[in-house]
Amino acid sequence: MIGKRQEYERMHATEQSLWWYRSLHRRVAHTLTQRFGERKDLVILDAGCGTGGLLESLRQQGYQRLEGFDASEDAVAFSRERGFEVAFHNLLAVESYHPTRTYDVIICNDVFCYLNDSQIIQILKEFRRRLRPGGVFITNNNAFSWLGGTHAVALKISKRFVLSELTAYAQQAGFHVWKGGYWSFLLFPPIAVVRSWQNLQLKRGWVNAETLSSDVHLPAAPVNQLLNGCMKLEETLLPLAPLGSSVYTVMEVTHG
């Protein structure tokens, strides 16, 4: 996605209101409360912070010790517009990002889809080294390769994941999966239909891959409210489901 300024503009414009982002941000906040109670002094790193939407959400909830970096100059610029002094830095060189700093929480959402297996494992090993005792690593990623559709082509996404893959990465890097599962379960049937239709269009050459844009856009307010309500219901009844378009994983350091 690096180099696609228009996609970062969409992200920046919708991160505080689009149902999908709001649900993800609530899930992260819930994880922090589950793990750390009401502590607001956590030192949190968002590695691959995009346009700073998650950092903004965390700040609004009282977390102040926030850091972030991204490999996109556009993303960094948008994050700085929100008042965050995020760094321009590549995740593949994470070991050189303030190498002596440690964190209670490291977050890396929807970035692994641009990396290969060995790169992911190496990055996880560095994250493990940087976590303080009792700390956690949180990662959200797109799920199931067949759900790619035009969104994946537009953003040049090379990989989608299943939970077992992330569990294997965790084990190889010295992590244990504390919590893991899928979400957007209630919306999975319509998402699957739309993405399957998009895949057919791509296969038949009915759409021009060079002119595609992502699925990130804000629907009409009533629709957005309805979808956000569906996600709130799911978060309450089935926060980690057996199916969904995203896979959410929380890892802790393996001891012994």
Segments (PLM) and residue ranges:
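Conserved N-terminal segment of class I S-adenosyl-L-methionine
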Residues: M1-R101, V105-N109, S118, L124, ...
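A short His-aromatic
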Residues: C113-Y114
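A C-terminal cap/extension of S-adenosyl-L-methionine-dependent methyltransferases
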Residues: I138, L187-G256
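Conserved S-adenosyl-L-methionine
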Residues: F175-F185
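Short, glycine-/aromatic-enriched active-site segment of Class I SAM-dependent methyltransferases
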Residues: H12, F137-K159, A168
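A short glycine-rich, Lys/Arg-flanked "PGG" loop and its adjoining helix->strand segment in the class I
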Residues: I121-P133
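Alpha/beta-hydrolase-fold catalytic nucleophile elbow
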Residues: N109, N140-N141, W183
